[in-house]
Amino acid sequence: MARYTGPVCKLSRREGVDLMLKSGNSGRKVLERRGSQPPGQHGASVRRRQLSDYGVQLREKQKVRRIYGVLERQFRRYYGIATRTTGQTGAVLLQILERRLDNVVFRLGYAVTRAQARQLVNHGHITVNGRKTDIPSALVEVGDVIGVRAESRKRDYFKDLEETKQLNRVSPPSWLSLDAGKMEGVVQTFPSREELDMSINEQLIVEFYSR
């Protein structure tokens, strides 16, 4: 399955929530303007149907998959890893998604969206423990240091981050620490469920794959 490259606001409207796929609060503004209107030319005249249990589970799975920008095959693989890991399967799944390098780059404020973070990783701007890493799906470990390549810091994008002290205004989650001056973040621990998005009902995803 190819990665979705269409209008990202359409995905948020389909799920009925802001998936944070655009910078700032533009995604939320679209939802406020369009309300619960589904995407498509007939969206204004179509009411959202009452979903079956399966439909509710599917929508929750799709919502989380789209938040993190993960394809179905990879998402299913993460679920398989979660089922074989000690702990509640749903919470472990979310923890795995949070540990993706592109998500950590986003959480540290190097990028304003996960899609942009994925590009920064793909283009070789990000280092893990001092070594260039260009795999967005790489999972970080406790103690890993996430930085920006010295060569990349000379580029306009990162020079602007430094000159405007934008990273000084970033408040990363408690499981990450950030040295804005060095452009380095450290994975202090793995995130607990309480630190993750409370609007996600991961049990619905477990039920979906358990059918």
Swiss-Prot record:
Alphabetized Pfam families for the sequence: Ribosomal_S4, S4
Residue span, S4 RNA-binding domain: 99-162
Region (Disordered): 27-48
Origin: domain of life: Bacteria
Coiled-coil region(s): none
Record key words, sorted: Ribonucleoprotein, Ribosomal protein, RNA-binding, rRNA-binding
Gene Ontology biological process terms from the UniProt entry: ribosomal small subunit biogenesis; translation
Keyword Ribosomal protein: yes
Function: One of the primary rRNA binding proteins, it binds directly to 16S rRNA where it nucleates assembly of the body of the 30S subunit. With S5 and S12 plays an important role in translational accuracy.
Record-linked HAMAP family: Ribosomal_uS4_B
UniProt subunit comment: Part of the 30S ribosomal subunit. Contacts protein S5. The interaction surface between S4 and S5 is involved in control of translational fidelity.
Protein name per UniProt: Small ribosomal subunit protein uS4
Organism the protein comes from: Herpetosiphon aurantiacus (strain ATCC 23779 / DSM 785 / 114-95)
